[in-house]
Amino acid sequence: MEYFDMRKMSVNLWRNAAGETREICTFPPAKRDFYWRASIASIAANGEFSLFPGMERIVTLLEGGEMLLESADRFNHTLKPLQPFAFTADQVVKAKLTAGQMSMDFNIMTRLDVCKAKVRIAERTFTTFGSRGGVVFVINGAWQLGDKLLTTDQGVCWFDGRHTLRLLQPQGKLLFSEINWLAGHSPDQVQ
């Protein structure tokens, strides 16, 4: 497992100067040609998402005003807080901020022919489903994972197994992204 704190992660500025990215993890680790990747992006201006042919992207708005996502003839979608939205990353998608507010979102990308991600918001203790990878990001509250305490803007990335996250306060929210491998594929084939 890899623990992270968003406030301590390195920041990569976008070439178009419209935002920045904090990479959480990739699988396989440290590979440019990843099967899946999780990141957090801060968007400061209207602009286009980077293209990633053969990938699916799931975007979840964490902070800021709603964001309008437009893709030519394919869709117009208003991204609302904590409501994941999936689209293929090989199409031009423009992001327009509402009311000029900066926004922050969680992104998970998966190779369409290898694995699939599912993103959910949890508000109570839960156990992961024995997936072969995933990411948890704490939106608020205090959560226990084994002997590790996770609080706002912290999280963990794992590559296999079942894990129980216990909510330690009356209220809390976390984003949970689970990776499931398609038939004929396994993370064991990669490592």
Curated annotation (Swiss-Prot):
Coiled-coil ranges from the UniProt annotation: none
Alphabetical list of Gene3D superfamilies matching this protein: Jelly Rolls
One Pfam assignment: HutD
PANTHER family reported for this sequence: PROTEIN VES
Family to which this protein belongs: Belongs to the Ves family.
Protein name, per record: Protein Ves
Native organism taxonomy: Bacteria, Pseudomonadati, Pseudomonadota, Gammaproteobacteria, Enterobacterales
